[in-house]
């Protein structure tokens, strides 16, 4: 008997409308029939051969005996079993036989059902995300004709799944949240979920939340100690800010999306950390130029920055690097004149996508271009791979230290300095040098 006989019927291939009754089939499987009192001694001997399928117990009561169902792939005959050990328990070939089973839709997992239905020559459904009671898909074009069936199978098979949605388009709106298509279940998008042990609540249809970033959120939060400072420029519903505030860090969190801002406040209150967090609802650049600027200046002037760490998170990978120039010339020389040279400036963690061959080099170039500055070894704290987003498209975190020079020199002033240096090197008039490409 071939193991393929335990798979769903071949006739369901290509099914687009879920017909559960079509999955019925009858198969022959090996079994041992033993007296009830012997079961506890026999099971350990055949445990690795037990037939394990959804909603099917491998040991069935029949009168005063027990039928132990075995997997037909390794067990072709009595001789396939550990016969000597079984005979010591008074189990012989007479206890061995084949029995007919009726399998149906309930006996296969979601993965087994979908593999049997979806086109064999195309890539199947590789993954999905769980957010509370919602299952979030990102189906490729060739699977769209099967989306209704896929949704029904997942709702049937996944515990506590009530809503299945598909990503309807790329994230291109102002607030960077997913555009969703309901393909099965309830149009109920308010969810409760936990990330790294912390509860969050939000409307998934109106905010951005990606459970695949939970490990990255945890990495950053682990860097923080009580008393540290976190400026979260694109805070969303709080996956960085709320855990940091719970650790008794001083947090300034911001998000442009008013719905995200609402749930950020809700999650801070729910997690009882409101006393450690200040929240704002504005553009990230405005937040940097106002709230972050004022709070950081006060800390640089009035506190011992060597006694705590300051971090700035910028998790908006599609465009966060475009906000880095806001740090250039954030302060005047006079504002930082009385600050000790021993001051410890913040570490920025900026996230970005890069597409191409050497994505790590590309993402560094993006950061340096937007900063209008090369990051030396002392400044650059690391470039960390976060996840693969698509073929040849990766997400990275670039961590670097801000410096007095960056914070007091605007991009324009930096460009002028570069042009002057070029002019001096080439011993030509600065205005002439400024027209040359290599001096820009």
UniProtKB/Swiss-Prot annotation:
The keyword Calcium does not apply. It is found in: Mitochondrion matrix; Nucleus; Cytoplasm. Its main location: mitochondrion. The keyword RNA-binding does not apply. S-adenosyl-L-methionine binds at residues 217, 255-256, 283-284, 315. It is an enzyme of class 2 (transferase). Its EC number is 2.1.1.228. Keywords: Cytoplasm, Methyltransferase, Mitochondrion, Nucleus, S-adenosyl-L-methionine, Transferase, tRNA processing. One of its GO terms (cellular component) is nucleus. GO terms for molecular function: tRNA (guanine(37)-N1)-methyltransferase activity. It catalyses: guanosine(37) in tRNA + S-adenosyl-L-methionine = N(1)-methylguanosine(37) in tRNA + S-adenosyl-L-homocysteine + H(+). HAMAP family: TRM5. Belongs to the class I-like SAM-binding methyltransferase superfamily. TRM5/TYW2 family. Specifically methylates the N1 position of guanosine-37 in various cytoplasmic and mitochondrial tRNAs. Methylation is not dependent on the nature of the nucleoside 5' of the target nucleoside. This is the first step in the biosynthesis of wybutosine (yW), a modified base adjacent to the anticodon of tRNAs and required for accurate decoding. This is tRNA (guanine(37)-N(1))-methyltransferase. It comes from Drosophila pseudoobscura pseudoobscura (Fruit fly). The lineage of its organism: Eukaryota, Metazoa, Ecdysozoa, Arthropoda, Hexapoda.
